[in-house]
Amino acid sequence: MRPFRPRAAIVLLGVPALLLMLAGCSTNRAGIYPYQWSIFWDSLLRPSPKILNGIWLTVSIAITSQIIGVILGIFGALGRLAKLWPARILANVYVWIFRGTPLLVQITLLYYGLLVARIYGWPDLVVLGITLPGQIQAGIFALGVNEGAYMTEIVRAGILSVDTGQLEAARSLGMTYPLAMRRIVLPQAARVIVPPLGNEFNNMLKTTSLLVVIAVPELYVTFEQLNGSGSTSFHPFELFLACAVWFLLLTTIWSIIQAFIERRVGRGYGGERPPGLFDRLFGARIRRADDPSQVSGGR
């Protein structure tokens, strides 16, 4: 049984207390800003179809972009570890560009830049009967290729954590290099890759809000539109507080899923027990500095 975590208990009790305190402030005592907490609670407890669509789009974009990032990360890591110098140069340049420039600039350039320069017009695409507008395609592509640069370093660190003798033994048994990587090296590297991969997806859920610059109607844009129209207009505090709570809920759900995945993949590095849910949410546990599972993409 895990010991009692006072800091976790304080946070768990403090968040509801803060919300109740805010709910009690039905009016501004100075009479400057007319709070309407019904907007806040309705956005959380009775979300409109528009909010639900924004949540669905946020999660869908995050999952799709993360999958693209993982695929690019695997190829990028293999490229950086390859013996062929063209592959190493290509992978290094890819990581250098997409880790060295702001994601917001990349999103703007890949959508508006390519569109205005008439390099690519981002026409609507129909996938499995679902129409994807151009800005959603551009957003997924931008988030995916940016994430791939960080996943390259994460996958590379995972591969390097596996003893080279494993690959040599597999090759001596007649396995080809791709087969040895797929059957021997990558499964062992998974327990080192999974923790930072989960953290990257947690960050991806929040990073989707940057797609506001190309008008993708994800969760943040949905609340921004609600703030400018109808009965909820000009109530930014209540609306964006509700938006923050929704993002917090999404990342908390993912943290729970991530904790179970890490326990399933392995019992931690070097026999150490993987962090629990409270440790993951509130940072109550001190990690070893030499633990490769804590390697991140260096954001």
Task: Give short role names for the model-derived ranges.
Residues R2-R299:
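Transmembrane alpha-helices and adjacent helix-loop boundaries
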